[in-house]
């Protein structure tokens, strides 16, 4: 069977295109995040996996759980997912939607791990450099990890730059063992 993220991709893309065309990216984002949270509930999981309910009943129940926050297009999206037995994929749909949204908005979340606390001026300079290099608006989150010994690890999407002392020592050890 295919991975859930793979199954969710066409639905996330369809939701993104509908949201973009309606200039409603944030509304859709909020709705998908809420739907993903609802889907994670154990009682909802049981409801969605119940063979005694039809797709129409599952969609209606799910829409009721979402409350009055959904517009008609979002309700129709839920109905399509229910018709295709894909309601449990909402967490993956939401995750992919956020990636498409960030790409549209030319934004990227960057995680910076360092061994020590970094000065704000250095962080600002790094954010500026990353913005230029990635051609995206950078949202920088920092974390301190003393096990790095020194240097830093930068994660931006699927790009990882390991400039840590720990990483360099690991490379050296690998080179010496061959």
Swiss-Prot record:
Protein name, UniProt field: ATP synthase subunit delta
Instruction: Give the signal sequence positions.
Output: none
Manganese as a keyword? no
**UniProt source species:** Teredinibacter turnerae (strain ATCC 39867 / T7901)
The record's keywords, sorted A to Z, are: ATP synthesis, Cell inner membrane, Cell membrane, CF(1), Hydrogen ion transport, Ion transport, Membrane, Transport
Query: Can you tell which superkingdom this protein's organism belongs to?
Result: Bacteria
Q: Which GO molecular-function terms appear in the entry?
A: proton-transporting ATP synthase activity, rotational mechanism
Q: InterPro entries per the record?
A: ATP_synth_OSCP/delta_N_sf (IPR026015), ATPase_OSCP/d_CS (IPR020781), ATPase_OSCP/dsu (IPR000711)
Q: What does this protein do?
A: F(1)F(0) ATP synthase produces ATP from ADP in the presence of a proton or sodium gradient. F-type ATPases consist of two structural domains, F(1) containing the extramembraneous catalytic core and F(0) containing the membrane proton channel, linked together by a central stalk and a peripheral stalk. During catalysis, ATP synthesis in the catalytic domain of F(1) is coupled via a rotary mechanism of the central stalk subunits to proton translocation. This protein is part of the stalk that links CF(0) to CF(1). It either transmits conformational changes from CF(0) to CF(1) or is implicated in proton conduction.
Subcellular localization(s) per the UniProt record: Cell inner membrane
Q: Name one GO cellular component term.
A: proton-transporting ATP synthase complex
Its quaternary organisation is: F-type ATPases have 2 components, F(1) - the catalytic core - and F(0) - the membrane proton channel. F(1) has five subunits: alpha(3), beta(3), gamma(1), delta(1), epsilon(1). F(0) has three main subunits: a(1), b(2) and c(10-14). The alpha and beta chains form an alternating ring which encloses part of the gamma chain. F(1) is attached to F(0) by a central stalk formed by the gamma and epsilon chains, while a peripheral stalk is formed by the delta and b chains.
Q: Give membrane topology per the record.
A: Peripheral membrane protein
Gene name for this UniProt entry: atpH
- What family name appears in the similarity comment? Belongs to the ATPase delta chain family.
Query: Matching PROSITE patterns, A to Z?
Result: ATPASE_DELTA
């Amino acid at each position: 069977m295919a991975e859930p993220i793979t199954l969710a991709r066409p639905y996330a893309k369809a939701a993104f295109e509908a949201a973009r065309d309606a200039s409603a990216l944030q509304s859709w984002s909020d709705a998908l995040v809420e739907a993903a949270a609802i889907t994670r509930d154990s009682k909802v999981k049981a409801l969605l996996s119940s063979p005694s309910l039809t797709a129409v009943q599952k969609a209606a129940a799910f829409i009721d759980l979402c409350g009055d926050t959904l517009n008609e297009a979002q309700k129709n999206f839920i109905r399509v997912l229910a018709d295709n037995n894909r309601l449990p994929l909402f967490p993956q749909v939401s995750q992919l939607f956020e990636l498409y949204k960030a790409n549209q908005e030319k934004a990227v979340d960057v995680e910076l791990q360092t061994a020590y606390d970094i000065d704000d001026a250095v962080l600002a300079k790094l954010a500026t450099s990353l913005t230029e290099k990635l051609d995206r608006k950078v949202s920088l989150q920092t974390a301190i990890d003393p096990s790095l010994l020194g240097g830093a690890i930068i994660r931006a999407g699927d790009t990882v730059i390991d400039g840590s002392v720990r990483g360099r020592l690991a490379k050296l050890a690998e080179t010496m063992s061959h």
